[in-house]
Amino acid sequence: MSGGRLPIGHGRAGGFTLVEVMIAMALGLLLTAGIVSVFVSTGKAGSVQMRMARLQEEARYAVGRIGEDLGMVGAQYCSNGGGLATARTWAYQDRLRSPLSYVPVADLSLPDNSVTLATTPTAPFALPSSFFMRGYQCSTTDCRPDVPLAIAPAMGSGAGSRVRGADVLTVRYLSGRGWAVRADAASPLAPFDIVSSTGDPPLGTFAVGDLALLADCAQAQIFPVTRAGTRFTPETRFPGSVPAGVDTLTDVRLFDFNRDFVTVTYYLKLVADADPDAPPGHRVAALMRKVNGDAAQEIARGVERLDFLYGIENDEGGTLYLTADQVDAGVDAAGVAIACPPQPPASATTKGCLWRAVKTIELHLLVNSSDELPTLAAGELAYRYSCDASVTCTSNADAAPPAAPLTTPLDNGLGKRLLRREFTGVISVRNYNP
């Protein structure tokens, strides 16, 4: 039976030594740590990229939406020439003139209006330049000129407040297609009829008490009317002055001044963050667009700075970029007075006359990612904003960028650990500003 005996030592159990096990565990931990690190880095990069993509999309839409309205500033029907109107024998040879109002300023009921006239007109007057465009340059403490509460809320750090240090801008232009008019060329203007055609708005939208704006490609007049069916009878609020006749050789159209003369105001507002995962009391900045005095609508979220520079054409043909308070005061950056451009006949005031000379508007937006990301590195927090060094913007056309990024946000109630990027645009004013 000795042939079936196993050799000595073949029955002992085999395995790893304690040192080998410890080495394997250490290698496993290192491998696990590496995998976790890759996942964490990938997650962080994805989070940053997602926020950056959202930031860029918000900025793209904001610049486009503002640009559409700024490009329409001062638009009138069929009379957007590039020079001062001079009455000619034939109306179609005339150039642009500002609409002539046959009602007092208070009766125009212009929404978001902060323009006051030194004297109350007692006769028909041309709408001042600042009725079509007026900006407000704001620091963290005040705005110049002051922004009435009827236009935008007061600056503050709570939800519902206007963002500190952000400009405000109100523009107006004529929109809509109006109605064709059958009228006599005789002056004064006699009762006239509306000729509706396909695509015209319903005549019922012209409400009782609305003012009429009548344009004939050479001039525009604003006056009260009474309506009976399709017949309109012009009136006046200035005794002894009645609307003038129109040129029947041109395409005369009637507009509802209260509805078609559009007022648009832009400002920034702090809104409460509705995200259930957001910290309590977290606020975000939003770009607001207010039309015809109605409730403001949120256009884009994350816009924390809004600044405008206005390129005016001086009497020598040069272009100067000024802030809103400089345009309103009629001075350059050094405080030197700038001559007013020629004013339309019967102009009510020369105050704010440089708004008539605005040819381009330079837009600056600082847009953030809305929600803070604690893991952001210093390089990711760095950004450059043309208006960060002071409350006064420097035009990109006039100065080189700073040597180093500016990384100190304004004290405007928003978080510090946010992605921030500047977006700019230069919008040409296509219509000669009245």
Describe each PLM feature range.
Residues F16-V19, I23-G67, G71-V73, N433-P434:
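Aliphatic-rich helix starts adjacent to a transmembrane/signal segment
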Residues G15, I35, A45-G46, V246, ...:
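General secondary-structure edge motif
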Residues R420-P434:
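Structural signal for terminal/edge beta-strands and the immediately following C-terminal loop/tail
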Residues M1-F16:
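N-terminal leader/signal peptides at the extreme start of proteins
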Residues A13, A220, T424:
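Short coil/loop residues immediately preceding or within conserved phosphate-binding loops
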Residues G67-H364, S370-L419, P434:
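N-terminal pilin/flagellin-like segments and related low-complexity appendage regions
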